[in-house]
Regions:
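Transmembrane-helix motifs of polytopic, lipid-linked glycan transferases
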Residues: 91-112, 147, 151
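Short acidic/glycine- and proline-prone juxtamembrane loop motifs at membrane-interface regions
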Residues: 41, 66-67, 137-144, 348
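Membrane-lumen/periplasm interface segments of specific transmembrane helices
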Residues: 28, 208-302
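Signature aromatic-anchored transmembrane alpha helix within multi-pass, membrane-resident enzymes
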Residues: 18, 22, 117-120, 173, ...
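Extracytoplasmic catalytic/substrate-binding loops of multi-pass membrane glycan-assembly enzymes
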Residues: 35-48, 61-76, 83-87, 234-241, ...
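Short helix- or helix-capping micro-motifs
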Residues: 25, 121-130, 134, 154, ...
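Membrane-embedded, lumen/periplasm-facing catalytic core of multi-pass transferases
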Residues: 54, 108, 156, 386-437, ...
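Transmembrane alpha-helix segments characteristic
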Residues: 16-23, 120-122, 126, 170-173, ...
């Protein structure tokens, strides 16, 4: 055992670690962008909104995206650096992700991980786990949310050890910053007084009253959060803030209607007429199954096992109040996730980023416990083999977050080729936002459709009289049917085909006037 790693990390050592983390984080972002230089679909939406904001068209920006702060941040970065909005998004996220890594290390230290070894382990987890690296090439708002969330959590854990007002202010500022990027930040912001009260070392006298108040706040926040997930972009008006009761009433009606529709689908398509009475039970079981499976997918199996191991053993946090606060944060995340699942009956992996990062705060202490405090000889041969397999598996999963080479290069190539042919507004129709973006026609919203079926129906109704080119993105199985359909029905042959590696094709057609 190297005793130098057991001693407390002084200021110089901490600054060296944070500096190295910043450099490595920027390098990882540059690498991920290099191997996946094709914009993501959400990125196209944010760029559209930023372009509207640049023109002072706030109404138009809100009609495109109902949470405009991230596009505004991209706009500011673009103006300051003088680069395009796509590059501005990459620069902003690279900086934000570097801040996330640094805040993760600082939060682990706030939990009691002040030794050199724990500081290095925290940096290692923050740099290699897929939750931090999988989305480095994406233009998304989640890094900004994680910065604010982790800042709030950092000050919350500092408050657990020393109840100073400045730490509470830090909690509010952090969660308020998080709410600029994702609405979940508002949930933590409004629940911060409850989280603070639960950090008290003395028993809370009115525990029943506090529990009732917390339940009411949780239900109201979950209702508004669910309504926000359901309401389409462009349907949000500034005037809604004047009638919060109407918001809650409308939200509850829409959520109840959505849940009833999903239960009806379960009754009609999954259960027979004699089993329809079990639809509510099936729906109730589906929710935790989706949360658990998505959690394992996001954390990955080896890291999930390490988290469970940490839950079963002493966390290693500085005190039990911090451990209790960590559990409260996890429960609050689960409430948010359950709300999403109840409404949508699915979860996107990156919805769990906040939950995953909170869970990963436990991992450095688990690794320190296994590698530092427990002797290798204490494990029998089977446990030694399992530990080695688990660690190697964890490293393999971490590497997988850094080898996401793009499979959509053909979309970019097709769009760039079309850019020279479709300079006039309305001249391109496509079923893919990325192709339209690289063609410079992403602002023609009416000409970008979600599927080939909608595109074909629009052609029948002559919906796009100014269109000169059609770009159809299809998978390998569907492409042959589409080619045959255009040949027989429309008498068109594709003039250009861009093929992707196991990712389908882009068929280019030129319309005859």
């Amino acid at each position: 055992m190297n005793l130098s790693f057991d001693q407390s990390a002084d200021r110089g050592f901490l600054l060296w670690v944070l500096g190295a983390c910043t450099v490595l984080s920027v390098a990882l972002s540059a690498w991920c962008i290099y191997i996946d230089d094709v914009i993501n679909n959400d990125g196209v939406e944010y760029i559209r909104a930023a372009e509207r904001l640049a023109l002072g068209d706030w109404t138009g920006a809100l009609s495109l995206y109902k949470w405009p702060f991230y596009p505004l941040f991209m706009l500011i970065v673009g103006k300051v650096t003088g680069v395009g909005y796509q590059m501005a998004g990459h620069i902003a996220n690279s900086v934000l992700l570097s801040a996330v890594v640094a805040l993760f290390v600082l939060t682990v230290r706030a939990l009691g991980g002040t030794s050199r070894r724990l500081t290095l382990l925290a940096a290692l987890v923050a740099l290699i786990h897929p939750a931090f690296n999988e989305y480095r090439a994406f233009i998304i708002r989640d890094p900004g949310y994680l910065v604010g969330y982790l800042a709030g959590v950092y000050f919350l854990f500092r408050y657990c050890r020393c109840a100073r007002p400045r730490y509470y202010v830090g909690v509010l500022v952090g969660f308020a910053f998080a709410s600029l990027f994702r609405i979940e930040g508002l949930v933590f912001l409004f629940c911060s007084p409850i989280l603070i009260v639960l950090t008290r070392t003395q028993p809370v006298r009115s525990l029943g009253l506090l529990a009732t108040f917390a339940s009411i706040v949780g239900v109201l926040l979950a209702t508004v959060l669910g309504w926000w997930a359901l309401v389409p972009d462009g349907a949000v008006k500034f005037s809604i803030l004047s009638d919060p009761v109407q918001i809650i009433s409308t939200a509850w009606d829409q959520i109840a209607s959505g849940i009833n529709k999903k239960i009806s689908i379960l009754q009609q398509h999954f259960l027979g007429p004699f089993s329809a009475r079990y639809s509510y039970l099936l729906f109730g079981l589906t929710v935790p199954m989706i949360i658990v499976s998505t959690t394992i997918s996001q954390l990955t199996v080896p890291w999930f096992v390490l988290t469970v191991f940490g839950l079963r053993n002493d966390s290693g946090f500085a005190n039990h109040i911090q451990a209790r606060t960590w559990i409260n944060l996890m429960l609050l995340h689960l409430m948010i996730l359950a709300t999403f699942v109840l409404i949508m009956l699915f979860l996107v992996d990156r919805y769990l980023l906040g939950f995953s990062v909170t869970a990963l705060l436990l991992i450095p202490f688990v690794l320190d416990n296994v590698l530092g405090k427990l002797r290798w000889q204490d494990f029998n041969r089977l446990k030694q083999v399992l530990i080695v397999i688990l660690l190697l598996w964890g490293v393999g999963e971490s590497v997988s977050g850094l080898d996401n080479f793009t499979r959509h290069q053909h979309l970019k190539e097709a769009g760039l080729w079309l850019a020279g042919q479709t300079a006039i507004s309305g001249s391109l129709v496509s079923n893919d936002r990325k192709v339209a973006y690289y063609a410079g026609r992403h602002a023609d919203l009416e000409n970008i459709v979600p599927s080939f079926g909608v595109l074909n129906n629009g052609l029948k109704k002559k919906r796009w009289p100014e269109a000169e080119y059609i770009a159809v993105v299809c998978n390998l199985d569907l492409c042959q049917k589409i080619i045959k359909h255009f040949k027989i029905v429309w008498k068109y042959d594709q003039i250009k085909v861009f093929s992707g590696h196991k990712a389908g094709k882009v068929l280019i057609y030129r319309l005859r006037r």
